[in-house]
Swiss-Prot record:
Subunit record text: Part of the 50S ribosomal subunit.
Record Gene3D superfamilies: Ribosomal protein L30, ferredoxin-like fold domain
Family designation: Belongs to the universal ribosomal protein uL30 family.
Recorded GO CC terms: cytosolic large ribosomal subunit
GO molecular function, one term: structural constituent of ribosome
Descriptive protein name: Large ribosomal subunit protein uL30
Keyword hit for Ribonucleoprotein: yes
Amino acid sequence: MAKATKKAEAKTVTIEQIGSPIRRPDVQQRTLIGLGLNKMHRRRTLEDTPSVRGMIRAVQHLVRVVDEK
């Protein structure tokens, strides 16, 4: 008998940039670029991993979590 396999859906988090990286430390600017954000009010849907959560926490004053699935 064949086993029914279900692909585990990866959890995702959608973030939006709400703050400007101008006059911010270089490490914060690079973190935003690492998250795929570089212009105001852009949104990205990323896989919800500990590394992504850490990056969001590092720039939490510049981004907003829109949706978590």
